[in-house]
Amino acid sequence: PSSIERVPVDVEAANGMLWAFDALYLGVNNYNDHTKSGLYRLTDTIGDDQLDKVELLRQISARGDHGVHAVRLSPDGKSLFLITGNNTEPTEFSDSRVNTNWGEDHLLPRMPDGRGHNRDRLAPAGIIYQVDPDGQNFEVYSHGYRNIFDAAFNADGELFTYDADMEYDFNTPWYRP
């Protein structure tokens, strides 16, 4: 049987958790100003099986529920993937697999949400980053999402995700594979 144990650290609002590289990685989205949004690493520094050290590897500006989300292990087990929604500002990155000349690329004139929801959110929107285990090098893996919360790799190492989109939005998405 499994048991649940409270981790004795002062971190809130973890939307994603991953155990890798002898550490617990957290994708944290700040809802209440207690814990900064970003990628965290929790480790056991004295060998007592208790996570006692909290490191904010990268602070990421995010707001609302479309912020920093899941953390996934790469198929080769050498890096992390951080999933972020469209209320997350792009963080500094060292490289990109996709073009970074962000644009709206709408086929028809822009039609912002009539109710005012996220009218100011433009491309690149949500981004999937590939990140080294120390959180120093961020590479844009894919971007253009609205509110992706998680992703998964298949047996061939292909990444799949689902975008929680505004079902009544008639514009084309920002997707960039």
Model-derived segments and their meaning:
Residues P1-P177:
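Beta-propeller domains with acidic blade repeats across secreted/periplasmic ectodomains
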